[in-house]
């Protein structure tokens, strides 16, 4: 956690109000603020996972090299411009055993509020994968800063 994010959050939420705080009281208040910041950040991360989704995605194998290419669309159903969104594709055998994972960035730009962004991917070896799943990952710094600034409560 960035000290700056915790301090912004603590100040904004009133943890550091008053000018009679001793060093020990400040440390205790910052610790309390840190716990609340983490709790709220986890809620925001869950909100993003539920409201920023991959749709219309597919993949196909090359029979000769066991490689895969695919594409998809990320829908941002939030009011936030979201930077640095990454995807992780997990390839599995018929019995559900994982073979490999691959990942990358959806885009180097932000995904606009209520916008969509298409992406494509290539994985050099997936063996005899019969199915795959995909998930998105969001930038921790973006999540903490958004919560610290009070843009998500």
Describe each region flagged by the PLM.
Residues 30-71, 152:
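Low-complexity, acidic Ser/Thr/Pro/Gly-rich terminal tails and inter-domain linkers that flank the onset
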Residues 34-40, 101, 121-153:
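Terminal connector regions
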Residues 74-78:
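Asparagine-centered strand-capping/turn motif at beta-strand->loop junctions
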Residues 81-84, 98-99:
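Short acidic/proline- and small/hydrophobic-mixed sequence motifs that coincide with surface turns
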Residues 86-89, 104:
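Hydrophobic beta-strand segments
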Residues 91-101:
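Short aromatic-acidic-glycine turn motif
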Residues 107-116:
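Short proline/glycine- and polar residue-rich coil/turn motifs
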């Amino acid at each position: 956690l960035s000290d700056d994010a915790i301090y912004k959050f603590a100040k904004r939420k009133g943890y550091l109000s008053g000018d009679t705080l001793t060093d020990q009281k400040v440390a205790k208040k910052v610790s309390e603020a840190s716990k609340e910041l983490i709790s709220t950040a986890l809620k925001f991360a869950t909100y993003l996972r539920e409201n920023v989704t991959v749709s219309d995605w597919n993949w196909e194998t090359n029979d000769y090299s066991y490689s895969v290419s695919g594409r998809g669309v990320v829908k941002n159903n939030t009011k936030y411009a979201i930077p640095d969104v990454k995807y992780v594709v997990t390839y599995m055998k018929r019995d559900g055993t994982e073979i490999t994972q691959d990942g990358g960035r959806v885009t180097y730009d932000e995904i606009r509020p209520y916008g969509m962004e298409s992406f494509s991917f290539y994985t050099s070896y997936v063996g005899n994968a019969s199915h795959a799943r995909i998930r998105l990952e969001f930038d921790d710094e973006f999540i903490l800063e958004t919560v610290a600034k009070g843009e998500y409560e």
